[in-house]
Regions:
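Outer-membrane beta-barrel transmembrane domain signature of Gram-negative proteins
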Residues: 70-99, 103, 228, 269-368
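Transmembrane beta-barrel strand/turn architecture of Gram-negative outer membrane proteins
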Residues: 1-23, 102-188, 223-256, 277-322, ...
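Active-site beta-strand/loop architecture of penicillin-binding DD-peptidases
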Residues: 379-381
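N-terminal, polar/charged subdomain of small-to-medium soluble alpha/beta proteins
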Residues: 262, 268-269
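Short secondary-structure boundary/capping segments
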Residues: 26-28, 161-165, 263-264, 324-327
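Residues embedded in well-ordered regular secondary structure
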Residues: 3-121, 158-162, 176-223, 236-238
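Structural alpha/beta core scaffold segments of enzyme domains
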Residues: 171-175, 206, 331, 344
Length: 390
């Protein structure tokens, strides 16, 4: 922290470590399968209950059973197999603050950069935030002020929400208790094929309902970004001892993009006859407001009167589009020119407006008895013309 010619600087750095705070409780007496039986062949039902993703199989007593990583392997529990999937996350945050002050003027600037390494493998989030506020007393009648906030988020492979293939927690809702996630992780490359066997099939514990959670995170890139800007300007003017006015305008806008890339091998999201698929979406929206208010205050004897009158103009605009295909021709190229299956498109655009007028009158007697009247009328573009006023 330092001070220079009426300007104060402050810089801080913070590093935190992240880890799951609560883990589900699992039983560790029985492994994958049904009715106490299991034998792996292809993880899709060709063996004995090897397509099951539930743990109603043989007791985990060390007997030798064919499993996805080899024949006649010890059938033992891995009590921490879900916990071991997660990694230590870190958050590094740097912040710079600058405050200036002078005769009738002042400002404040804050910039924060934050880099997050997620607890889910190969997930990250980069944040940038800035805010600026300033005010100035122009003269005895006019005061100006304004502020702006900007945020930018850029994520990579952040887990999806809900019961979906893109959420590793969906897999862990089931998951064989004998599965060692270290084995799933260590087979990142096998026989030259990512997460695969020599025959090209994916190295996985179950092929009916789930994918290797490491394969899901490393071979299915999902970038997303969002920018958000809020700004406002205000002017206060004092006409005389009893009349003042305020004019302000503000805007709130954002822009976001999201992509999901599906490698060949996805169960639900990529056509098996092609080399993957993808979805992409874009959206932007803005709300603007312009408001003006006049305020009159007058005292007559024991009576105090306050009258307000003003209006507001609000505009909302939103645009969104997206496209997707479940089949691409060349693996790893996620654009429309590489679509092997005709993509689907979505597009929407909305524009709305609301104009408002409002006022109030307050009369107070002897600083105790008060009578107040208020009124407001709005005109909305979303209503039929004959009913737009309310």
């Amino acid at each position: 922290s330092s001070v220079l010619d009426g300007t104060r600087f402050n810089f801080t750095t913070r590093v935190t470590s992240d880890a799951p705070s609560i883990m589900p409780k699992y039983q560790n007496r029985y492994g994958q399968g049904f009715g106490g039986e299991f034998k792996y062949v292809d993880g899709a039902g060709s063996g004995v209950n090897d397509g099951a993703d539930e743990s109603w199989g043989p007791m985990l007593d060390g007997r030798l059973i064919d499993q996805f990583f080899g024949k006649a392997q010890p059938w033992v529990a891995h009590p921490n197999n879900v916990k071991d999937y997660f990694q230590s996350g870190t958050t590094v945050s740097n912040n710079l603050n600058m405050v200036t002050s002078g005769k009738g003027m002042g400002s404040r600037l804050s910039i924060t950069k934050e880099d997050v390494k997620g607890i889910v493998p190969n997930s990250s989030l980069a944040k940038l935030a800035g805010s600026l506020s300033a005010s100035a007393v122009v003269n005895s009648k006019l005061t100006l002020s304004g502020s702006m906030q900007y945020t930018q988020n850029k994520g990579l492979n952040r887990p999806e929400n809900g019961y979906t293939e893109g959420n590793p927690f969906m897999t862990f809702t089931w998951f064989g208790r004998q599965v060692d996630v270290a084995s799933l992780k260590n087979k990142y490359y096998n026989a030259g094929s990512p997460y695969g066997f020599a025959d090209g099939s994916l190295y996985n514990w179950n092929d009916n309902y789930h994918r290797n959670p490491y394969w899901q995170q490393y071979e299915n890139p999902a970038p997303d970004s969002r920018e958000h800007i809020i700004g406002q300007l205000t002017a206060n003017y004092v006409f005389n001892s009893w009349l003042s006015g305020i004019v302000r305008t503000g805007s709130d806008s954002y822009r976001q993009t999201q992509e999901e890339h599906f490698s060949a091998g996805n169960i639900d999201r990529a056509n098996a006859s092609f080399n993957g698929g993808f979805t992409a979406s874009n959206a932007r929206a803005q709300e603007t407001n312009f408001e003006g208010i006049l305020t009159a205050r007058k005292s007559v004897g024991k009576f105090d009167f306050t009258v307000n009158g003003g209006g507001n103009i609000r505009r909302n605009d939103r645009f969104a589009n997206g496209y997707s295909t479940s089949g691409i021709l060349v693996a790893g190229i996620y654009n429309l020119s590489n679509a092997g299956i005709a993509p689907t498109f979505t597009n929407s655009e909305t524009r709305t407006a609301v104009n408002s007028m409002y006022g109030s009158a307050v009369a107070t007697y002897d600083r105790f008895w008060t009578v107040e009247l208020t009124g407001r009328n709005d005109w909305s573009s979303t209503l039929p013309k004959e009913n737009a006023s309310y």
